[in-house]
Amino acid sequence: MRVSLRFTILAVSAMIFFPVIVFIYVVEAHTSPKVIADDQERSYGVICDAGSTGTRLFVYNWISTSDSELIQIEPVIYDNKPVMKKISPGLSTFGTKPAQAAEYLRPLMELAERHIPEEKRPYTPVFIFATAGMRLIPDEQKEAVLKNLRNKLPKITSMQVLKEHIRIIEGKWEGIYSWIAVNYALGKFNKTATLDFPGTSPAHARQKTVGMIDMGGASAQIAFELPDTDSFSSINVENINLGCREDDSLFKYKLFVTTFLGYGVNEGIRKYEHMLLSKLKDQNGTVIQDDCMPLNLHKTVTLENGENFVRRGTGNWNTCSNEVKKLLNPESSSEVCKAEAAKCYFGAVPAPSIPLSNIEMYGFSEYWYSTHDVLGLGGQYDAENIAKKTQQYCSKRWSTIQAESKKQLYPRADEERLRTQCFKSAWITSVLHDGFSVDKTHNKFQSVSTIAGQEVQWALGAMIYHMRFFPLRDSSRNLIVKETHSSSESLWAPLFFLSAVFCLFVLVCAKEQSVLCFDDKRRSSFGMSRSQYSYKMLKENRTSSSFLENFA
């Protein structure tokens, strides 16, 4: 009876102790990894570029790993292409019918939701940023459109729509976002390790950033970083921080950034045609010789006031360049720009003393199309070669160019591009050299359409800037995870102590039980060998182990 009682005590103790250990282990094993996995889960963001001719949707995603690094944002990829969709017309056309504005964006919201997990949608921010088109409509129309979007869009989508995320942005911020996107795509925000002295730990240094010029249809934008030592002061200087901590200067940048309204290529053509009309009035005719069109190309022009005249191409591109240059210097300029020592862009906007020729600059939009589509000279800028090829092209008869186009000699250019190439070549080069004072021979300028295989959009820069505080959330969660691990680890010390006590208890019980068994056997037979005794003990232990395993 004594053996049976002790064995029962041992079994009951095991039944109580081992389930407790297993329970704690399971809770620890299933809770902590889940928290860690949550910390690494993917987040999403949606942005709409509401331009003058249409609205484009972009969907981005990221995994935040550290609050000491810049947030890493990438486009969501579907079928090997970034998720993107454009709808027309522009948002500004709803100025007279604002009640339809939110419904107009429904297809974009539905597309975005198809590429975002359902459980993520309530935490996915939606940004609607309107640009030039919305800036031009009356204020009451602007407010009516924005009000409709802010009130009705949350009812259309389950994604996160905040009122402050729906607004009209300044042209300056388009430039800032573009600058961020370009440098991000080039990896210029990645930290590099430098050793100040041999044997010391590496210090983090940041790379030199690049500047950008974006030549659109209505305006041109420029943005580049100023050295910290540059004392230049202007309304066009902006200090931005891309990091999530205000006390960290690693991602703080001082930029010169501004928009030149009226200096896009389409506005340039409009100014040029007004200049031609003023010359024609002096001649009392209806047809004027035009050096900025291919030989014998005719174009009938109707101006805003209803006046008509005909441009007839002569293909003299050198003369064209000289005429275009006159359009860049305004008749009136600020007193600062009239000063001989002052440096100004386009003779009107005060600029830093740092020469743009010394800065690595990237040209987008028309700087790419006008050098690449017809001339095939996109990439590293070569002013002499561009002038030579443009002169050769413009001196051709228009009928010859048409024939060459049919033979696919200009596969990337439509007819409108072929008609306007001469003027656009003159405009973009004149803006670069005469407007921004970039040296024709010694410069670091290049035209691009994509970086690392992706088309660079200011929307990416906007998402990076507005999500910059996101890593702080994960940093706080990491701290909670760390503390949770510390707390759970501290539980194992008493558990180990209890395990030791239990093991001691088992040993004592096992010893007493073995003595009793030996005494009983000795009474029945003193002739049992050691091997037989050992076998009996081994068999009994196996039985006990099997019993205990049923409760493990």
From Swiss-Prot:
The enzyme's E.C. designation: 3.6.1.6
Localization, UniProt: Golgi apparatus membrane
Glycan attachment sites: 190, 284
Catalytic activity, as annotated: a ribonucleoside 5'-diphosphate + H2O = a ribonucleoside 5'-phosphate + phosphate + H(+)
Catalytic residues (UniProt): 174
BP GO terms, sorted: ADP catabolic process; cell differentiation; CTP metabolic process; GDP catabolic process; gonad morphogenesis; gonadal mesoderm development; positive regulation of protein glycosylation; regulation of cell migration
Family: Belongs to the GDA1/CD39 NTPase family.
Induction: In contrast to uda-1, expression is not induced by stress.
Function in brief: Seems to be able to hydrolyze ADP, UDP and GDP. Supports mig-17 glycosylation and surface expression, which is required for proper migration of distal tip cells during gonad morphogenesis.
Parts of the chain on the Lumenal side: 28-489
Parts of the chain on the Cytoplasmic side: 1-6, 511-552
Gene name tied to this protein: mig-23
Membrane-topology annotation of the record: Multi-pass membrane protein
Gene Ontology, cellular component aspect: cytoplasm; Golgi apparatus; Golgi membrane; membrane
Known tissue expression: Expressed in body wall muscles.
Alphabetical list of InterPro entries matching this protein: GDA1_CD39_NTPase
TM region(s), chain numbering: 7-27, 490-510
Keyword Membrane: yes
GO terms for MF: ADP phosphatase activity; GDP phosphatase activity; ribonucleoside triphosphate phosphatase activity; UDP phosphatase activity
Organism: Caenorhabditis elegans
Main location: Golgi
Identification of the protein by name: Nucleoside-diphosphatase mig-23
Keywords tagged on the record: Developmental protein, Differentiation, Glycoprotein, Golgi apparatus, Gonadal differentiation, Hydrolase, Membrane, Transmembrane, Transmembrane helix
